[in-house]
Amino acid sequence: MKASDVRALTADQLKDELAKLKKEQFNLRFQKATGQLEKSSRINEVRKDIARVKTIARQKAAEVKA
């Protein structure tokens, strides 16, 4: 997911996206532990997507306060 795509989302959509990504991250960790994970690089992608969503949500919250 690109940062420009994330910036287009509203605050509620960001929360939903974050919840979805965290759920996916949990499932990927579970797959890794059981040896069923096919694309191990997806774990890093999801982790970075979570960071992007959190960063942009924080920036939007700061804009509202300013």
UniProtKB/Swiss-Prot annotation:
UniProt GO molecular function: structural constituent of ribosome
Gene3D superfamilies cross-referenced by the UniProt entry:
1.10.287.310
> Which NCBIfam families does this entry report, sorted A to Z?
L29
Protein name (database record)? Large ribosomal subunit protein uL29
Highest taxon, organism lineage: Bacteria
Which InterPro entries does the UniProt record give? Ribosomal_protein_uL29, Ribosomal_uL29, Ribosomal_uL29_CS, Ribosomal_uL29_sf
Can you supply one Gene Ontology CC term for this chain's record? cytosolic large ribosomal subunit
Residue ranges spanning the membrane: these are none
Q: Answer whether the UniProt record assigns the keyword Ribonucleoprotein to this protein.
A: yes
Coiled-coil boundaries:
none
Record keywords, A-Z: Ribonucleoprotein, Ribosomal protein
Tell me which family the UniProt entry assigns to this protein: Belongs to the universal ribosomal protein uL29 family.
| HAMAP family from the UniProt entry | Ribosomal_uL29
A GO biological process of this protein is: translation
